[in-house]
Amino acid sequence: MSDEKQELFEFPCRFPLKIMGERHDEFVTTITEVVRVHAPDLAEIDVVLRESSGGRFYALTVTVTATSRQQLDNIYLSLTGHPMVKMVL
């Protein structure tokens, strides 16, 4: 058995991130900018917004072309540290 960790993903790969936060006029723009710091090739078509049934929250699905586990970790850390973000899956 190898001591190296086996990767669960083969990079590059398409990877969807689900980002939840309270409804805010700048939510989509702000969160997209945060992700683009780590994935500059993010296209508008890769961003899908859904509103909660009560209209209080947004759920944003952002699909990036991930090039490494480190890149995904950096995106996750940036998003979870942002004040507009309640949860990232």
Curated annotation (Swiss-Prot):
Instruction: Say which domain of life the source belongs to.
Output: Bacteria
- What protein am I looking at? UPF0250 protein CV_3095
Family stated for the protein in its record: Belongs to the UPF0250 family.
**InterPro entries from the entry?**
UPF0250_YbeD-like, YbeD-like_sf
Write down the species: Chromobacterium violaceum (strain ATCC 12472 / DSM 30191 / JCM 1249 / CCUG 213 / NBRC 12614 / NCIMB 9131 / NCTC 9757 / MK)
| SUPFAM superfamilies in UniProt | YbeD/HP0495-like
**What disulfide bonds does the UniProt entry report for this chain?**
none
